[in-house]
A protein has these predicted regions:
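The alpha-helix within a helix-turn-helix
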Residues: 57, 61, 66, 96
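A generic alpha-helix surface/boundary motif
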Residues: 51-55, 89-93, 125
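A short, Lys/Arg-rich alpha-helix, primarily the initiator
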Residues: 2-60, 147-148, 153-155
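Amphipathic alpha-helical segments within well-ordered protein domains
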Residues: 77, 93-97, 128
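DNA major-groove recognition helix of helix-turn-helix/homeodomain DNA-binding modules
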Residues: 89-105
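Short amphipathic recognition helices of helix-turn-helix/homeodomain-type DNA-binding modules
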Residues: 103-158, 304-356, 364, 368
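Long, charge-rich C-terminal accessory regions
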Residues: 157-329, 334
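Recognition helix of helix-turn-helix/homeodomain-like DNA-binding domains
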Residues: 62-91, 109-115
Length: 371
């Protein structure tokens, strides 16, 4: 296997890759035995000093003078007691600066609480990443941001479909900059290239969505010809993407795992908003599209079709390919100790007798038996 895993992650992997793990057993494992990776323990592995809480208290008190010390302390206690996690990206940057974390560590924490790591095409996050790199603190980073040239209204809609500058290009321009003068000049050069949405994820989304919306032609006996039918967004959702997941927002009676899996599950409205460039492509949707299409978007030769590959080799290759996609899109790689990722990996471990989407749907049916 090409993926390096910790002991706990490997235990989770062994369970999902075991041929004896049926869909029912998978649902039970998710509900009661999977050791979910948690925010605060992850943070303590990045910063092992004894003054972690003191640093965070000082940093948030400086960064948010309008909040009382009691309110800040309560938030920090909730994080350490695993009751909540930071809810906005700015808080993660404050943590990154307070603990002298690297860009990659801060980006990972952002991806931990949201769909994406540092968004290098978003000017504020780009400036934060530079300030992390050169060792500034949060307040110094804010001062630096205030010195930057005014930014035109950020674009939500890609120019000419797919011709906007991608995040990777921005990263390449800025990743090695170590001084303010060079950063500001490059910043000026890219003012029209900044944007809000993640375009690479949209690229992957639209390719997969088009495959589902325009399935292979079917033979029409009435006309003795092949007919191409374009599916509606609602039909794509119903036929391919629901997978027995309950609809609606009610979650009060759900377990933690049920809430994790149902959260941000796509629906026809969210698909429409993504297609209209009003909403970002979620990590959950991107992975779901891979499962439903099995990573196949055309008829080109693929080594995964070869019979000499073992199930273990196929799983390893799918895992590797998905991680490449996630990295390209600025998302965290698959984590066997993340509930949804575990389900994705379990679904990838399939053979000719059952499709990936069927395998995922069976587990969801056991997890939500009354729906």
């Amino acid at each position: 296997m090409r993926i390096d895993l910790t002991d706990l992650s490997y235990q989770a992997f062994e369970q999902l890759s075991n041929p004896a793990t049926t869909s029912f057993h998978a649902s039970e494992y998710l509900q009661s035995r999977l050791q979910i990776r948690e925010f605060y323990p992850t943070l303590t592995k990045m910063y092992s000093g004894n003054d972690l809480m003191e640093r965070l208290l000082h940093a948030f008190t400086e960064a948010k003078p309008a909040l009382s010390s009691a309110s800040i302390s309560r938030n920090l206690r909730n994080w350490t007691n695993k009751k909540t996690v930071p809810q906005n990206r700015e808080d993660i940057f404050i943590i990154g600066f307070a603990l002298n974390l690297s860009e990659s560590q801060t980006s990972y924490l952002l991806g931990f609480i949201s769909d994406y790591g540092i968004h290098y095409r978003e000017p504020r996050e780009l400036a934060f990443s530079y300030c992390l790199r050169i060792g500034r603190n949060y307040l110094e980073a804010l001062d630096f941001i205030n010195q930057l040239p005014p930014i035109p209204p950020l674009k939500k809609l890609p120019d000419a479909g797919f011709e906007s500058v991608r995040t990777q290009t921005i990263m390449d321009h800025f990743s090695n900059i170590q001084d303010d003068e060079t950063f500001i000049q490059e910043f000026k050069n890219n003012l029209t290239n900044f944007g809000v949405l993640h375009l690479r994820a949209y690229d992957y989304f639209i390719k997969s969505f088009e495959c589902l919306k325009n399935p292979y032609p079917s033979f029409d006996p009435a006309s003795s010809d092949f007919k191409v039918e374009e599916y509606s967004i609602e039909r794509v959702m119903d036929d391919y993407l629901t997978l027995h997941m309950p609809v609606g927002k009610k979650r009060s009676n759900y377990s933690l795992i049920q809430k994790m899996l149902k959260a941000d599950w796509p629906n026809a409205t969210s698909l429409t908003n993504i297609l209209n460039h009003k909403k970002d492509v979620s990590r959950k949707l991107l992975l779901l599209l891979y499962i439903v299409t099995e990573g196949v978007l055309n008829d080109d030769y693929d080594e995964l079709d070869e019979e000499y590959l073992t199930d273990e080799q196929r799983l390893d290759e799918h895992w590797w390919r998905i991680n490449l996609i996630l990295n390209e899109c600025g998302m965290n790689e698959l984590d066997p100790r993340n509930a949804y990722d575990w389900l994705v990996l379990y679904s990838l471990n399939t053979n000719d007798t059952i499709g990936m989407n069927e395998k995922m749907e069976q587990v969801i049916q056991f997890l939500f038996p009354s729906h």
